[in-house]
């Protein structure tokens, strides 16, 4: 078979022409003189139709019957070259169909373990390397890819430079209880929790920088929102105000949603995501509310029928139920700003005139997805930062490079970070974060 391979997503450019597709058989059906193949190649899913009389006419009775019989006996995930004529088909969700004229088996797939029937989560996770091939998991990866693409596009357009922070570090970014420790030639080293501290050095050199890579948190959490290894985008910038930072974060999240709408609309359709709701999140301004206003709201509504959360006092941190209620109350992504300094990281800058609160923000996504962005202005004053670290009992000698940034030309600066997997689950409308990354690492799972 002479092969100029065309991807499924591009068949629309070949209507009326004969093409060859390299694909896998996702499913098959039919009876008698007709067979239907559901084909996938990573770019899209596509139906091919084979008619027995056409094969007999083209190849003669013996060879034509043999080829048609081969099609009817194809097993799930067999890899094939399929040749046929592309036709428009209004009945198809894809809009096109392939009138199959020839087929060649590349790799057999006998006893494929993930059949169309229902399987338990543990079984699917044990076979994650194969589960990734299913229609919904392909859609999740397409959405993830669109978000990553939109991230690079957004920051490039806004004057940010990609800056690579190290994954191995000699100190902790925030919580030392959640570190993965390893031996670095006789010296303790840690897998990165965040690239932020190094990114601040980048901002002092380059003005606006962003990092994108894996981070690691040794959290012993089994919730649907936590992974021990995930991908984070951190951005850091000099000379931006807190309000300008919130504007940037809002524009970024809207750009990510728009990027998925533009680049992966079929993935959203596969997952049955409410596209009109996503469009509303783009069209409407995000809500901004202070931490203290949020606490007041929670207290005022804690006896409501839908208030499935525990009582909080001013100074307490939010749990997932509180975040869910707040974002659902406003119906759009909501910034909660100016948290108590006591429950936030040491490097956050106090609110002018109110040292008990810091210039920070968490962006809470509606529909129960909770926090997707955390950010703050950083304390740029050397003496103030050292005093804060001393109050917390921190060893300042471990942060000499970080403190140097305040000694040599310090400037107002800030930044934020977003866990890509949380953004993927939010945009995709799925409930568990394990499906937002190819091979999830969780408390009790490190394989495959």
Swiss-Prot record:
Gene Ontology terms, MF aspect: asparagine-tRNA ligase activity; ATP binding; catalytic activity, acting on a protein; nucleic acid binding; transferase activity
Catalytic activity entry: tRNA(Asn) + L-asparagine + ATP = L-asparaginyl-tRNA(Asn) + AMP + diphosphate + H(+)
Example of a GO biological process term: asparaginyl-tRNA aminoacylation
Enzyme Commission number: 6.1.1.22
Enzyme class at the top of the EC tree: ligase
Record Pfam families: tRNA-synt_2, tRNA_anti-codon
Top-rank taxon: Bacteria
CDD domains on file: AsnRS_cyto_like_N (cd04323), AsxRS_core (cd00776)
Annotated TM spans: none
Coiled-coil annotated spans: none
GO cellular component: cytoplasm
Keyword line: Aminoacyl-tRNA synthetase, ATP-binding, Cytoplasm, Ligase, Nucleotide-binding, Protein biosynthesis
Subcellular location(s) per record: Cytoplasm
Family, as annotated: Belongs to the class-II aminoacyl-tRNA synthetase family.
Subunit (UniProt): Homodimer.
Protein name as annotated: Asparagine--tRNA ligase
Organism listed in the record: Streptococcus sanguinis (strain SK36)
Lineage: Bacteria, Bacillati, Bacillota, Bacilli, Lactobacillales
């Amino acid at each position: 078979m002479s092969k100029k391979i065309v991807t499924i997503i591009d068949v629309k450019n070949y209507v009326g022409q004969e093409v060859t597709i390299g694909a896998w058989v996702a499913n098959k059906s039919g009876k008698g003189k007709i067979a239907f193949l559901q084909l996938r190649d990573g770019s899209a899913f596509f139906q091919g139709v084979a008619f027995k009389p056409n094969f007999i006419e083209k190849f003669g009775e013996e060879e034509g019957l043999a080829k048609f019989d081969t099609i009817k006996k194809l097993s799930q995930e067999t890899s094939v070259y399929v040749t046929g004529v592309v036709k428009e088909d209004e009945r198809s969700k894809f809009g096109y169909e392939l009138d199959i004229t020839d087929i060649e088996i590349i790799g057999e797939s006998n006893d494929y373990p993930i059949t169309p029937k229902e399987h338990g989560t543990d079984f699917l996770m044990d076979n994650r390397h194969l589960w990734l091939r299913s229609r919904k998991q392909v859609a999740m990866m397409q959405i993830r890819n669109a978000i990553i693409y939109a991230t690079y596009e957004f920051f490039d357009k806004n004057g940010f430079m990609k800056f690579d922070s190290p994954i191995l570090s000699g100190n902790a970014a925030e919580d030392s209880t959640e570190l993965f420790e390893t031996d670095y030639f006789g010296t303790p080293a840690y897998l990165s929790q965040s690239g932020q501290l190094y990114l601040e050095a980048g901002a002092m050199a380059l003005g606006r920088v962003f990092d994108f890579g894996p981070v690691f948190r040794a959290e012993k959490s089994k919730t649907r929102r936590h992974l021990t290894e995930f991908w984070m985008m951190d951005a850091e910038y000099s000379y931006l105000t807190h309000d300008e930072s919130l504007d940037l974060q809002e524009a970024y999240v809207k750009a990510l949603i728009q990027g998925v709408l533009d680049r992966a609309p079929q993935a959203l359709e596969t997952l049955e995501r409410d596209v009109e709701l996503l469009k509303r999140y783009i069209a409407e301004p995000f809500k901004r509310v202070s931490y203290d206003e949020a606490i007041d709201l929670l207290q005022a509504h804690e006896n409501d029928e839908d208030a499935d959360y525990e009582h909080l006092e001013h100074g307490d941190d939010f749990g997932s139920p509180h975040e869910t209620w707040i974002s659902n109350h406003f119906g759009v992504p909501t910034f909660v700003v100016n948290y108590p300094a006591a429950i936030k990281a040491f490097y956050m800058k106090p609110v002018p005139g109110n040292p008990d609160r810091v210039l920070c923000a968490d962006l809470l996504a509606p529909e129960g997805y909770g926090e997707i962005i955390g950010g703050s202005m950083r304390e740029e004053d050397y003496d103030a930062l050292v005093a804060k670290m001393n109050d917390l009992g921190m060893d300042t000698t471990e942060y000499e490079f970080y403190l140097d940034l305040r000694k040599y030309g310090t400037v107002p600066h800030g930044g934020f970070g977003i866990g890509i997997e949380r953004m993927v689950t939010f945009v995709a409308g799925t409930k568990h974060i394990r499906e937002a990354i190819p091979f999830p690492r969780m408390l009790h799972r490190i394989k495959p």
